[in-house]
Design a protein with these regions (language model features):
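Secondary-structure edge/capping motif, primarily at the C-terminal ends of alpha-helices
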Residues: 72, 76, 108-115, 172-176
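Amphipathic C-terminal alpha-helical segment
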Residues: 93-96, 158-180, 195-202
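Amphipathic alpha-helical packing segments from all-alpha helical-bundle domains
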Residues: 66-71, 99, 103-105, 114-145, ...
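Hydrophobic alpha-helical connector segments
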Residues: 56, 70-102, 154-161
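Generic hydrophobic, amphipathic alpha-helix propensity
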Residues: 7-16, 32, 57-61, 65, ...
Length: 202
């Protein structure tokens, strides 16, 4: 008999494999149960709704992303250097595993919409702190370096910087999925984005 918690780990592994192999639309409790070899009720015991299952899949990746972003920002870094390091580190993090990126930023959008029965809204509330910590560190550096006077403005900028990068990674992920490479190299696009956000001094 599996140890307590082992079934939950097998469920997550199966769900992750389903998403990677056939896409988020295929992630159903029936599909997960069949892959693990347990009943649908056994899956529901550990993850009572799809929002909880998606949260369990996504949250560790978001926390790893946050750690990568925060770790790239060195103490006393100037705002341009901090931005360049932040964007470059997250670009490497995501482009090295586009399936993980899809799991993080595409899967939660599939199926149940935020706020329906309050389930997905609660899930997003649990996930939010990991990304907030990342924004806070970049924002503090931007304020300390004089880029912004107010922390609220710096946080808004941190969110915009991150979102712009995610948009670029989404283009890369789409090109990868369609086997239709973009005209420009991926690293060249990241460099161009970084140069727009934080131009290097002449």
């Amino acid at each position: 008999m599996p140890k307590r918690g082992e079934t939950a780990a097998r469920i997550l592994a199966a769900a992750r494999e389903i998403v990677r192999a056939t896409g988020p639309d295929s992630l159903t409790f029936d599909a997960v149960a069949a892959k693990v070899g347990v009943s649908k009720q056994a899956v529901l015991y550990w993850y009572p709704n799809k929002a909880r299952l998606i949260e369990a899949l996504v949250r560790p990746a978001l926390e790893a992303e946050s750690a990568a972003g925060q770790g790239a920002i060195s103490d006393k870094a100037s705002p341009p250097r901090a931005i360049r390091a932040f964007v470059s580190a997250l670009a490497v993090f995501h482009s090295s595993d586009l399936d993980r990126f899809r799991l993080m930023y595409v899967t939660p959008q599939i199926g149940q919409r935020p706020g329906r029965n309050g389930q997905m809204l609660t899930t997003l509330g649990r996930i939010h702190p990991a990304t907030t910590e990342m924004y806070d560190k970049l924002a503090a550096t931007l304020v300390e370096g004089g880029r912004y006077d107010r922390l609220v403005e710096a946080r808004r900028a941190a969110a915009a910087i991150h979102t712009a990068l995610l948009g670029l990674i989404l283009r890369m992920a789409m090109a990868d999925a369609l086997n239709a490479p973009l005209r420009a190299r991926n690293d060249g696009l990241v460099e161009a984005l970084v140069d727009v956000m934080a131009p290097e001094a002449a």
